Amino acid sequence: STGTGKHYDFIFTDDIITLDEPTTTPNIEVRPDDLFIMLYTSGSTGVPKGCMLEHRNILSFELSHTQICGINSDSRVTAYASYGFDASMMETYSAVVSGATLHIIAEEIRLDFVALNEYFIKHKITTSFMTTQVGFQFASACESPYLKALVVGGEKLAPIDPPKTFSLFNAYGPTECCVYTNIYKVAKYEDNIPIGKAVPNV
């Protein structure tokens, strides 16, 4: 029970291979207000809270995100965020709704900016998300002519000169609101970089 009067069955990913279930897709109806995922907050204000996001939440967000970053079927998007971080939905499902190619970044190159830059160039990556401090460093080191949008989020973005060849976005939003609610394109050097305005569909 979730305290909302609704009951949900949960399964852990480790248990999936032990299930004796058919491999065909079940014929079920999915409604906009059906539960899509439960994510836990960081617990910065106390005990982590489970946030129940519905199908309409993630679809509404992805329609905004793909528009902001210009993601389409020709795009090459990275899966950089860890699976338990809500930003991983932004990456994965932006590719699903747009038909973009999704590149899962290997653990061994995630903090190796030389290797990461080479990967971005070799695979013509167009869109990526990174946590703020990692993205701050990578934005200064990236030499890929293919990158169009780098979104950073998770903490305050330090002052930075805007990249010349791609757009740098500072995103903010609580887990409860499905990844980010506000976004700001860094277009000039500022001592205090704002979180910007609310995205469409908030």
Q: Each PLM stretch: what is its role?
A:
Residues 2-32, 150:
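ANL superfamily adenylate-forming
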Residues 24-202:
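Motif- and composition-driven signal specific to adenylation
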